[in-house]
């Protein structure tokens, strides 16, 4: 292993816009944010419109020379391309520019390697990196061996990726075996949770939309949050109290981004399953972001890929205090500011109202002999009105379909 370099890398960004490219400007803005998240200093960027990518060097020969001059003049150490490069393009660009060249996918994988905290998260990132690198290692070992550390070559934790092509397939097999064991245990825990009467809520959204802030607001506990991309990788599930004795579970997991590498979606499938096996998906959107509609589409596309579109949803437009003249595009929705003083009470009420729409209304009469059963009912139902007539208490409220059997305990 080569020691990871600590110095800040000076990077130059390159993007090519084809006639059918969507949201190109947004994609380039994100590339800059990704580079900064990875710890780089972005010195400049270059964009070009073309009918198609150059099969050898991605950009045309004339523009390639302009980039080379910029690299030399600004002492650039790394060029980051806003597209997935072929192994051939990668080699040719490095030979022409004389510096390390990585693409958007490799940059995202690198950030995931930095962010991974749990054993499972590190395994998932390592697997995604190896799957990405494998076709680039075959016949391209020399190119990759020249990458003397830094952005694009970091592995989970402190060490760098092992770029020995002879062992990569064995590493992939070994990691997949380890992840199967982890997933078996996760599946057991998930199965118990599915059998539980507790209502399950999952947070989903674009990276940096504020999911962890909402998690912290509702739990009054510390979940790492920051104004940066991919602050959270590992799925976190916590119990929260919404009203009276009513408890639910709340799961936060990795955020999405445009052009999320397929290797990551595949490797993190078990983690993303945590948000799939819920009763309600809360889609968090940054209302203050001018590109929020594009972010919505990206998340919905990935949800479709993961077969999650049929799960009941609530859209939370977060950071509403920073959004002027905002018009929601998804329903049902609620405008919130997760960092406002009253945010917890507001969020609790918003969730309860959405749950009422999904639950079954009920009214029961409770005789004194069965009053002791009310406590258990309060743990799974939203209690509305309670009235006493003589010794009989009439309770109305809402309860999930899967828990309606609990009402039978009160019937004669």
Residue ranges and their predicted role:
Residues 2-3, 26-29, 52-68, 234, ...:
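Switch II of P-loop NTPase G domains
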Residues 1-110:
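N-terminal accessory targeting/assembly segments
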Residues 99-149, 156, 309-314, 319-368:
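Canonical P-loop GTPase G-domain recognition
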Residues 30-34, 68-71, 85-95, 245-246, ...:
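Conserved C-terminal guanine-recognition region of P-loop GTPase G domains, centered on the G4
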Residues 146-262, 275-276:
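Conserved G1/Walker A P-loop phosphate-binding module
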Residues 358-412:
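NTP-binding/hydrolysis catalytic cores, primarily Walker-type P-loop NTPases
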Residues 17-21, 50-52, 84-87, 106-109, ...:
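Conserved nucleotide-binding/hydrolysis micro-motifs of P-loop NTPases
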Residues 18-22, 54-57, 115-119, 160, ...:
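Flexible beta-alpha connector loops of hexameric P-loop NTPases
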